[in-house]
């Protein structure tokens, strides 16, 4: 496995690989890799000759009061996870290389970034789309893989790639969960033992609403009330949003169907966690 730390070297590597007729897959990450990331890498390995994983804690997607400095970093651990999953190249650039002096160009997707995380984290998605656009231009992948836990992010990146005629396939992969249902996330490392137990309210609320839907309930108001009640029973759980949206457009809905998205953002202690499900899809 090769580690590349500069934009110039990564671009040269990718151009040479393409000249040789090799296909490239990319799994963009912020590091502190877990089994959810590994599942993306394993799929990426199947889809291309060369699998690249980027590890870059992107400063432009963090707000001034968010956890950029505290975000967990462990490159040695990440190397082990990546190598085990079959990664060929780790691209781990420095912020000064990705955003050199004088940088002033940003990518912004309009409508899709306004609700949900876009409403509670101003500027977040501009940072996400900008860094992903840069990674796609640098690595030149034929396919890029993202987890569906960040459902809105996936929708935004797909929109950006389509709108800007980017010659890359964007693939969304299922949420990977712990045995007790908690969605895998690098931020789970922040949780203390009691908070870890309380964090199960997200997946429990989703499962409860989905069971009601499968039993025939279609009223979003009724389903939302149930979600709020399940989370509200947990001490210290603070809801950022518990929203029902169309799974394709992210527009609000009043009547649920199989493509309805339930999207949650909940603070457990100081840790903000997100989770989601599509009501008609198996979890």
Curated annotation (Swiss-Prot):
- List the active-site residues: 37 (proton donor)
Which positions in this protein are listed as binding (R)-pantoate? 61, 153
| Entry keyword ATP-binding | yes
Keyword Magnesium among UniProt keywords:
no
Q: Name one GO molecular function term.
A: pantoate-beta-alanine ligase activity
InterPro entries from the xrefs? Pantoate_ligase, Pantoate_ligase_C, Rossmann-like_a/b/a_fold
Q: Point out the signal peptide segment.
A: none
Pathway assignment? Cofactor biosynthesis; (R)-pantothenate biosynthesis; (R)-pantothenate from (R)-pantoate and beta-alanine: step 1/1
Residues annotated as binding beta-alanine = 61
Covalent S-S links between cysteines: none
For the ligand (ATP), the binding residues are 30-37, 147-150, 176, 184-187
Give the CC-aspect GO terms: cytosol
Q: Which reaction does it catalyse?
A: (R)-pantoate + beta-alanine + ATP = (R)-pantothenate + AMP + diphosphate + H(+)
Give the Enzyme Commission number: 6.3.2.1
Which GO biological process annotations does it have? pantothenate biosynthetic process
Stated family: Belongs to the pantothenate synthetase family.
Q: What NCBIfam families does the record point to?
A: panC
Q: List other remarks.
A: The reaction proceeds by a bi uni uni bi ping pong mechanism.
User: What role does this protein play?
Assistant: Catalyzes the condensation of pantoate with beta-alanine in an ATP-dependent reaction via a pantoyl-adenylate intermediate.
* The protein's name: Pantothenate synthetase
> What species is this protein from?
Geobacter metallireducens (strain ATCC 53774 / DSM 7210 / GS-15)
């Amino acid at each position: 496995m090769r580690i590349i730390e500069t934009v110039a070297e990564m671009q040269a590597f990718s151009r040479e690989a393409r000249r040789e007729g090799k296909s490239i897959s990319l799994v963009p990450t912020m590091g502190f890799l877990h089994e959810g990331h590994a599942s993306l890498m394993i799929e990426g390995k199947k889809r291309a000759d060369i699998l690249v994983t980027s590890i870059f804690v992107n400063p432009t997607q963090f707000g001034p009061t968010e956890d950029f400095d505290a975000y967990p970093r462990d490159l040695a651990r990440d190397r082990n996870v990546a190598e085990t999953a079959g990664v060929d190249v780790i691209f781990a650039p420095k912020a000064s290389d990705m955003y050199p002096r004088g940088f002033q160009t940003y990518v912004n997707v309009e409508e899709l970034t306004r609700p949900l995380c876009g409403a509670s984290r101003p500027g977040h998605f501009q940072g996400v789309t900008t860094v992903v656009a840069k990674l796609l231009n640098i690595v030149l992948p034929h396919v890029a893989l993202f987890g569906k836990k960040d459902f809105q992010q996936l929708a935004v990146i797909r929109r950006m790639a389509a709108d800007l005629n980017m010659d890359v396939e964007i693939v969304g992969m299922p949420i990977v969960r712990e045995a007790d249902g908690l969605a895998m996330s690098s931020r789970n490392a922040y949780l203390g033992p009691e908070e870890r137990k309380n964090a199960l309210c997200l997946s429990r609320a989703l499962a409860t609403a989905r069971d009601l839907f499968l039993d025939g309930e279609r009223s979003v108001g009724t389903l939302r009330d149930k979600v709020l009640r399940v989370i509200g029973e947990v001490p210290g759980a603070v809801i950022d949003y518990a929203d029902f949206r169309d799974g394709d457009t992210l527009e609000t809905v009043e009547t649920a169907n199989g493509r309805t998205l339930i999207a949650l953002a909940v603070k457990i202690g100081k840790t903000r966690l997100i989770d989601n499900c599509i009501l008609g899809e198996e979890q």
